[in-house]
Amino acid sequence: MKKVFLLMLTLSCFLFGCSSQKDVKEYPSDYPDSSGYGIDDIYYPDNSGQKILSSDIANVNYSHIDQGYVTASLNHKSEQKIKLLIRKGEKSYYYDLINQNPVAFPLQMGNGKYYLGIYENDNYAMKKSLTLDVQIKDELSPFLYPNQLVDYQPGDKITSIAIDIVKKDKNDLQRIQNIYNYVVDNITYDDEKAVEATQKYLIPNLNNIIKNKTGICFDYASMMVAMLRINHIPARLICGDTDVEYHAWVEVYIEGEGWINPDIFMDKGTWTRMDPTFASSKFDYNGKYQAIYYY
């Protein structure tokens, strides 16, 4: 597996590419100031409530679907593979259930009918299922909470780091750039883990990433999304295809602009094509990005 990885931060809209000088936009120097947040302001999923999809192997709490998530946990350790299926229309997300403590899973496909299913064994026999009419109060909510792939808990080191590195910033653009720079400057690409990831699915562990200061594309993206969400900046981890290989990257929501795609980045006061993560790996990528999954 070639040492390339795709953590992309994008800070412009209206363009899906920026390869020519005519595409350059002026930096929005008048972007509105906004107050920062503290440790006590971080959003965490709520596992209270009595709306439970219950089986002998796992439970799914859907009491807070209006906030854009469900929580799920194993009832006991299992030698069998246990999966949670979340489906809306033709789009399906399968998650491994591996924890006896409740973990959040996003309802990121918008309002409408969702199917939840608990499955067991290699053949994934259905244990319990439920169809829900989901109406999310704020469409950005699924991208403001931790979840299985962007997992942080109260007291985790990443929460204090994320708050500290933006404490002098006056607006979200400054916060986004400082978080981006922190991730790129402090994490080294892990070649051995990249090889391991070709053999099995590795869920990002943010505590280990912070401790070891190494990771692969999935880890870079998860860490950056976590730091943004901790600061109330909606962000989503995206997995998909590039011209090189399957990767993970980041999209961020900018007030007044919307979701920003991974082809544009801000460099010293102008909008221009830039990929500092590829740059840090000494790899110049100018290809396409095709999103498949959003987390």
Could you say what each language-model-derived stretch is?
Residues 5-171, 260, 291-295:
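N-terminal accessory/pre-domain segments preceding catalytic cores
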Residues 175-179, 213-228:
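Active-site nucleophilic cysteine motif
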Residues 219-295:
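Hydrophobic/aromatic-rich core segments of domains that either
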